[in-house]
Amino acid sequence: MDTSTILVATDLSARSADIVQKALPLAHKLNAKLHVVHIIEEKIFTYLDDADTLLEKAQNALEKLFPHIPKEQLHCQKGKISSSVAALANNLDAKLVILGSSGENGGLKSLFVGSSTKDIVRSLTMPALVVKTTNDLHVDKLLIPTDFSEASRWHIHAMRSLFPEAKITLLHTFVVPFSSRLSLYGVKKGDVNLLEENLYTNAKNKAALFMQNLNDDSNQVDIIVREGGLDAGVFTGIANMHGIQTISLHTTGSISLFAFDLLLETDKDVIINIV
């Protein structure tokens, strides 16, 4: 079996060090080498004369934090954090980049001084797993929103390739156009209900065709169709009902804006795949 690479970005905090420790069993499960990177924001060097000493001390801090990881898999660099993480991930041909989120109560603030998780995610060409929970990493169950697009199909296959043993639950939502206004316009409740039933039937038919065209193991992928918008609270609630810790999204079509909103609001771990 070929060995792949997982890259974890760390700011040397206790929280991010804990994420590295949690990434180790995931890397083992996926037969992947775990690399760790710390980027020193380049602007820091404008205030210091001895850049080499700072880099050396940061490298030593990495090695002290993670003595069980081979030194050649620990990287300390200077530069713009988002582009530097992305460049190293590309050079390593990483299949997954793992990031931590900071801030109280699941709020997403700066991951590093001068850079944000969103900036890093947008710079990547591979999936990013943003860790928001304090639990061990669990990717055996994934919740994925789908709009039945080709990009969505590609994303699902990408997740199946990355996590071949994962049980995937797809979620498709539909909305009744102008539902809050229809009664004001004199539309009877029975007619509104009939419209909703027709839209639901249409969505279920599209879901069945989409599942058929996935050419995947039906025991590993199922789908939920429900009325409503892509709301982070509802989405997180569905994840809770199904015992799912990790939500996975791609960033095109109707999912695009929702991806980063969900990243802000949910208390679940989130995989974002730039398509």
Go through each PLM region and give its residues.
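Gly/Ser-rich helix-loop-strand patches that form or flank binding pockets
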Residues: 86-136, 238-275
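General small-molecule cofactor/ligand-binding pocket signal
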Residues: 35-37, 73-77, 129, 169-171, ...
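GTPase G-domain guanine-specificity segment
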Residues: 181-184, 202, 207
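Structural beta-alpha unit
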Residues: 1, 53, 66-99, 212-247, ...
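Short, solvent-exposed loop/turn segments at secondary-structure boundaries
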Residues: 46-50, 109-112
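A short acidic, glycine-rich active-site loop
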Residues: 54-60, 190-202
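Small/aliphatic-rich secondary-structure junction motif
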Residues: 1-49, 141-192, 215-216, 265-266, ...
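Well-ordered alpha-helical segments embedded in enzymatic catalytic cores
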Residues: 19-22, 84, 155, 233-234, ...
